[in-house]
Amino acid sequence: MMGSMLFRKRTLVTRANFLLFRSFSVNVEKLSDASAEIAGILKQENWRDTLVSSNLSIEINPEVVLSVLRSKRVDDPSKLLSFFNWVDSQKVTEQKLDSFSFLALDLCNFGSFEKALSVVERMIERNWPVAEVWSSIVRCSQEFVGKSDDGVLFGILFDGYIAKGYIEEAVFVFSSSMGLELVPRLSRCKVLLDALLRWNRLDLFWDVYKGMVERNVVFDVKTYHMLIIAHCRAGNVQLGKDVLFKTEKEFRTATLNVDGALKLKESMICKGLVPLKYTYDVLIDGLCKIKRLEDAKSLLVEMDSLGVSLDNHTYSLLIDGLLKGRNADAAKGLVHEMVSHGINIKPYMYDCCICVMSKEGVMEKAKALFDGMIASGLIPQAQAYASLIEGYCREKNVRQGYELLVEMKKRNIVISPYTYGTVVKGMCSSGDLDGAYNIVKEMIASGCRPNVVIYTTLIKTFLQNSRFGDAMRVLKEMKEQGIAPDIFCYNSLIIGLSKAKRMDEARSFLVEMVENGLKPNAFTYGAFISGYIEASEFASADKYVKEMRECGVLPNKVLCTGLINEYCKKGKVIEACSAYRSMVDQGILGDAKTYTVLMNGLFKNDKVDDAEEIFREMRGKGIAPDVFSYGVLINGFSKLGNMQKASSIFDEMVEEGLTPNVIIYNMLLGGFCRSGEIEKAKELLDEMSVKGLHPNAVTYCTIIDGYCKSGDLAEAFRLFDEMKLKGLVPDSFVYTTLVDGCCRLNDVERAITIFGTNKKGCASSTAPFNALINWVFKFGKTELKTEVLNRLMDGSFDRFGKPNDVTYNIMIDYLCKEGNLEAAKELFHQMQNANLMPTVITYTSLLNGYDKMGRRAEMFPVFDEAIAAGIEPDHIMYSVIINAFLKEGMTTKALVLVDQMFAKNAVDDGCKLSISTCRALLSGFAKVGEMEVAEKVMENMVRLQYIPDSATVIELINESCISSNQRVEADAVP
């Protein structure tokens, strides 16, 4: 008998190991298969646990890691970086150099430059020879397929060596890049030159300088300055002077920045060299372009003091700069100064001043200059009139604008369609649609044909005012004039009709515009998408989104933001990121809302690093975060418990001049409460009052919860009373929190009294007394349990909400654990009478109760009733009932349920067994002498990956054999 048992044990071990090998092993010779398997695991959220528990028969060696990185099977480089870090942290063997290169390239391709730099720095720290590192990056770059600029990683490598202080290696990278025809940035070259000067490596300095010249790198003042220092340090003073004069030549071609040019100009004056007029003109022009107008004006004074001639050109440069800087008064002063100097003033200077003044809205000054121009004998031309008319119309003074239009006619000045259009637009904006229409008829009568812009303005305004018939009449007249509607006209029609929900008419114009050879754009499709969304016809909206893409139309940022938001709402952050990257690749610049929506989606799906990277990218693109953007970050880090980070972002937000609102404070306050930093939460509450912000119900709910969990019920109830005094109605969460807090301190009686503190009650919810019941049945005395149960059943708590399935499940479970099955069964029937459906938890509690009391015969009808009621058993329920069948010797029925359980797992993985459950099942079959059945069950457990490794298999087999031996010994007893 014992020999047979030993043989069976060995057979089981052999078969189990074979099954494990077939399920988890990877052929070492097939590297790509291993790479594919690992890549598949990496696509899972819990890839680390899966990878560790997979027990791959091959070791994850450097060759496999390299294969995974170069295979491009994993789209998320951040996940590849996490995998690489995890493998590298094992410190078993050194990773291959090419692995670093491929990973850095992938990160660069995804725009994660900071992460790429960290990988490069780790590569440098391995102390590989720079030639090998360079060769690896070149080789991998040639093999890599991506959209990143080839020069990005080489620049990062250069930065890495500089940051580590490896100057010679940085020079090697600089020199080697010449072979790839890469032009280094001037900023990088200057950093390298500066380092070489500090280390007095003039030999390498001149090599780098020569390379810069050969690659036509444009020098700035600082570069020339370092060159002069190098010459002087080498004793070549004359060469240093030559560089200075060469810099003057560069200055004349305006290749230096303005500050550098100013410094050079000062050095020239100090050396007794008076800059040429051309030099001053370039400087004034440069200063005006960067809006340093006071500096530009001071140069005008300096020119005069040095005897440099001032002419019309110099003044015009400064006047133009002042006008572009919206400083029309100063420009007007220069005009008078020119008159005093006897410099001829050209009419266009007046026109420019009048134009800017009109745009600034200083119409009195503009009109005064206009009248002064006439007084000086100059006749204003069409531009001056057009500027004034536009200014008056912009200020809604359409009548004054129209009078100037009449004056133009009297002076026989040709009126352009643009000027007519300005008056038409002004009248439309002021609501005088009939007057605008009369101007159009007046145009036609005078022989000036209205253009499509003017007609579109009229049509658009008629549609906005729901005068659809007039809009169609104007459209018809436009066509009769031989003017074909353009894309803007059709878009105005489609947008106006879509907003009025006249979608069929809008669609007819879409068909017409396509027939006329016009291609719909994002505004066209956007009108349909917005119209259908507003009408809650989402399927139709999706149809137009798809049609837009199929037609190759780029969406605008509003549509892109909407798509990103929808993806994030559905938890599809990969698709959301893809939509964002597609938007960026297509040159569409998002706004703060775009980035906020994406960051919020990433945080909600635990992509914290990616959310931070998007925030940095947002700042890098010059898009200023708003309160909502900062709120997403503060809320995300607060929920993660990283209050140091959340507080830092809060401080940054304040430093940026943004004022936090109550919602922002609630986010921080909640984070501090969850982290147990209740005093900091109280400080925030006080700070809100100091800043004039009124805490709302959420504020009080949050901090009351914090004090309850910290055990300070006195402060919690004080805030509870304060909340009600301020007219804020506590919701069910507040009551639940207070109940839970009282019960934690074993003050159940006080918890019961809470329900009588608010005569108006709170939002209908069973949560407060579910919390109470849980504590009462867990720790309360029998009398208290009976009292609460009676009050619950007689409706005393009904104003707070009727008992739900959770209420009954709590009570039934505790009664079953106490062995009070009759009371539990009575509650079960009351639950059904209250039209509440028992759940799998309800039935499992009853089954456990009967099993504990040894009343297994009563378990089986309960289980049958659960199945008949449509309950889907979980692994706990299956385990309980199967063990009951085994204990009663009903092996066949137990095996039927085991097969059902295995089949269910194969379909939806919804019933995966734990090791303890596996142990109980195998032991149960072994104890009743069903070793063949136990063997079959074990094979299924291995196949479905319930058992993680061979060691566990052997352990379970040993236990089963022991149980079987005990059965044999029991049978042998006479």
Swiss-Prot record:
One of its GO terms (cellular component) is mitochondrion. Residues 1-31 form a transit peptide. SUPFAM superfamilies: TPR-like (SSF48452). It is found in: Mitochondrion. Pfam families: PPR, PPR_1, PPR_2, PPR_3. Gene3D superfamilies: Tetratricopeptide repeat domain (1.25.40.10). PPR repeats lie at residues 96-130, 150-184, 185-219, 220-250, 257-275, 276-310, 311-345, 346-380, 381-415, 416-450, 451-485, 486-520, 521-555, 556-590, 591-625, 626-660, 661-695, 696-730, 731-761, 765-799, 804-838, 839-873, 874-908, 914-948. Keywords: Mitochondrion, Repeat, Transit peptide. NCBIfam families: PPR. Belongs to the PPR family. P subfamily. This is Pentatricopeptide repeat-containing protein At5g61990, mitochondrial.
